[in-house]
Amino acid sequence: MASSSPRRQELLKQLGLEFESYAPEIDESVQYNETVEAYVERLAREKANTILQQFPQSIIIAADTSLSIDGKIIGKPESKQHAFDIWSTLSGRRHDVFSGICVAASNAIHSCVVKTSVEFQTLSMADMELYWATGEPLGKAGAYAIQGIAAQFIPRIEGSYTNVVGLPLFETIQLLKRVKAFN
């Protein structure tokens, strides 16, 4: 697996797959005029290709997750203020979570993008302060973890729950089947 994300590792373990995890080093900068869909798919493919070069006989799973609201790509918070800015934007609104998934093997590379719409309740400054104090928002796209404390802020989603966690399992299995790595 081309990821050091504990959440992605936990999700893959649910499938009963044996795997090793490697963190690829790639440039995650957004390219000029790049859509969120193109961005997450490009990063997933770059991550997979980077690790496949090191382990050419392996099957590599890679993913990247970002949010989009008002046409803007929202990644991980860089500071407390950045997290608060993100939450202020998400507060009381719907946003979309996109994951690019790539499964790469020596004979084939397949990828796709999955979208889930997430509704956030209106957050007070006290909500934001308390949530920040938990440490949970760090390292998470959109500065929240749907599988954790932030679940209390999300009344509904439309689409794949595991996509919002960071690895849409249904689509991952479909890609593994395409490279004949899953029955």
From Swiss-Prot:
Enzyme Commission number(s): 3.6.1.9
Biological processes annotated in GO: nucleotide metabolic process
Family to which this protein belongs: Belongs to the Maf family. YhdE subfamily.
Keywords: Cytoplasm, Hydrolase, Nucleotide metabolism
One example GO MF annotation: UTP diphosphatase activity
Enzyme class, first EC level, given as a word: hydrolase
One GO CC term, this protein: cytoplasm
Protein name: dTTP/UTP pyrophosphatase
Source lineage: Bacteria, Pseudomonadati, Pseudomonadota, Gammaproteobacteria, Moraxellales
Reactions it catalyzes: dTTP + H2O = dTMP + diphosphate + H(+); UTP + H2O = UMP + diphosphate + H(+)
Pfam families referenced in this protein's UniProt entry, alphabetically: Maf (PF02545)
Protein purpose: Nucleoside triphosphate pyrophosphatase that hydrolyzes dTTP and UTP. May have a dual role in cell division arrest and in preventing the incorporation of modified nucleotides into cellular nucleic acids.
Cofactors: a divalent metal cation
